[in-house]
Amino acid sequence: MKQLRYLLKREFHLFFTNKTMLSVFFMAPIFYALLLGFTYEKGKVTDIPVIVINHDQTPLSNQIVDMLEDNQTLKVLNYVEEPAILKDEVIKTEAGAVVIIPERFEANMLQKKYPEINVYLNTSNVLTANFASKAIQLTLGTFSAGAEMKALQKKGMNADQAKANIEPYKANYITLFNTTSNYLIFMWPAMMAVVLQQVILLAMAVTFSEEFKRDSFIKDFAGKHKYAILVMAIKCLPVWIFSNLNILVFYLCSLYFKIPLPENAMNFFLITAIFVVAATNLGVLVSIMVPDALKATQILMVIASPAFIISGFTWPNYAMPDFITYFTKIIPLTPYLEALKIMVVEKGSDYLTQKYFWHLFILGWVYFLLGWIALKIKIKMLFKEYHLSEDYDDQRFV
């Protein structure tokens, strides 16, 4: 018991005296939580610059311009003349779209010649292009329906008849999840999961690889070295404990940014706990197998860096090649993000997250078993290197 207390004290001392570990594990999560929170705080993109070139300059064309200006998503940039090089003007003004109203627009409408309004979308940024496109379509669609209703009413139809004539059926579009299309609610929880996995892997990358370089490892773990599970637990304990502190930080930030919380807190913490264990065990495995701390870090970052992109959270898995889909299944972040989306964004029933819990559970066990085997082999190699018997036991602890 005395030796166990010494080992725990030793491990926490190593953790708190490692400045890199402290900055990564405590400063990085707070920094990214606030940075991403303030970045996406508005939730929606508004005031997207849109170039409007009105060649007609009539009451009807001006009405379209006014309607575009009334849309809070758009910020209209009025042009009387079309720029010589339109693409350069789009780049210079960072416009999300260009709306060109042709000459004789009003006259052709009154004569039923169906004039065309050209809308050019700047798809160099797909996100702003989609927001701009949706806003412009809504505005022009409203204007078109209103103009057609007026034309039918002039022919003697009442408002209801005119509406039925231009809209023979009604389609209702009902949003089920994230009804306000808030980008903060969609992205922030997922990015915090990415940050948590990243700091865990960075912390674990140096845990064993650095430990094996210390001559004190054999002496300090004398008597306990035969119990690889205990050695692993002692080395992981600080990360497990302080991961909970990071989760608490994320919780407080979510309250500030008004991000919805999971309805079943127990289910959330259970899945998050198994995610932390799975990510920790992955880090342990690589740290044991790769003796150099820098190389271990590089390998884990190769796994972790693209994890969010290939997780299926934004770009669906069914649109990826099969070999990438299979690779994503061995990264703890993938099932956790799926469960997180159900719990936070979709507010789904608890049973829908069960398969992701078991996915993480299996990953955790597989990485644990592989790490345990690797550690047993590594300890034997160290005893052989130092020409010591495995019955070696040094009880000189303070």
PLM regions with names:
Residues 57, 241, 245, 261-398:
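Membrane-spanning alpha-helical segments of multipass transporters and channels
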Residues 1, 5-9, 185, 224-237, ...:
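Alpha-helical membrane-protein architecture signal
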Residues 226-253, 357, 361, 365:
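Selective transmembrane-helix segments that form parts of the transport pathway or gating/packing helices
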Residues 200-232, 236, 380-381:
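Juxtamembrane interface at the cytosolic side of transmembrane helices
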